[in-house]
């Protein structure tokens, strides 16, 4: 009789432990499923500067996040977007400036939650057009600068990331015969990116 009671007690204890472990696993899985978007250990994301498509161009970027750090590779073509209007110090009303297909490298750090401060290096090729003659010439510029933006997640995967970029570059001039074009040393440009988090690993 005592052996039978002892056996039943052992079974009850083992069953309770099993259910306790199952509940613990369920709690952990639930916590993971409700974790914040900025709490990931690592993630792979793809995104696009969607306004470029509205002007007949395109933009694609793929990024990898580790803890607070983020690296992105991008390619941009601005179509008919006139980037000369973004020039701060010496933009010219006599010329237009268009983004031709250009690559870029971005390195960022999350200051707080999804607020990202980043720097970049973009090997831009601009097509410069003189308005009065329609003559077009290419200008190559290695641009750097700073950006600040915030990822607003819609659910677990999709996000909208508005921000502001400050582009810096050295002096460059093109001779159009009747006039010289000097590219602005500083561009100030708002940006709006749409993205998808393809994969993530929780902390």
Residue ranges and their predicted role:
Residues 40, 51-54, 95-100, 136-143, ...:
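Short sequence motifs at beta-strands and strand-loop junctions characteristic
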Residues 152, 184-203:
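Outer-membrane beta-barrel "beta-signal"
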Residues 163-167:
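Short, loop-centered acidic/histidine patches that primarily coordinate divalent metals
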Residues 1-27:
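Bacterial Sec-dependent N-terminal signal peptides
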